[in-house]
Amino acid sequence: MLGTANLPSRNKYKAKATILHMNRNLYLVAYDICNPRRLRQVCRYLTGYKVSGQKSVFEIWVTPTELHTIRTELDKLMDTQADRLHILSLDPRMKPRCYGNASTFTVQHFCIV
């Protein structure tokens, strides 16, 4: 990793700016959280990592270390008996199929979040 820096955030979860390097993978994160307070916390946390998304489904482009951190933090925020979370690895070699208003996004080789 080339470098990270803490950024100010409106919530208690600090967003991290990371200079993109080649060891990132694309994941789809979908969640169903029963409690409104936990729902807001999970949504705010994932917003710091998303490249796109809508409501309770986000696409995130992260390193294996960041993915481990995300899993650990979400495990703390969720009630594992009542809430559901899916993290699906998306194969970057597959061509995306878009329908309706959907459009593909491109990831730059250098990106500051």
From Swiss-Prot:
Its cofactor is Mg(2+). Gene3D superfamilies: 3.30.70.240. CRISPR (clustered regularly interspaced short palindromic repeat), is an adaptive immune system that provides protection against mobile genetic elements (viruses, transposable elements and conjugative plasmids). CRISPR clusters contain sequences complementary to antecedent mobile elements and target invading nucleic acids. CRISPR clusters are transcribed and processed into CRISPR RNA (crRNA). Functions as a ssRNA-specific endoribonuclease. Involved in the integration of spacer DNA into the CRISPR cassette. Belongs to the CRISPR-associated endoribonuclease Cas2 protein family. PANTHER family: CRISPR-ASSOCIATED ENDORIBONUCLEASE CAS2, CRISPR-ASSOCIATED ENDORIBONUCLEASE CAS2 3. Mg(2+) binds at residue 32. This is CRISPR-associated endoribonuclease Cas2 2. The keyword Metal-binding applies. InterPro entries: CRISPR_associated_Cas2 (IPR021127), Virulence_VapD/CRISPR_Cas2 (IPR019199). It comes from the Bacteria. It comes from Nitrosomonas europaea (strain ATCC 19718 / CIP 103999 / KCTC 2705 / NBRC 14298). The keyword NAD does not apply.
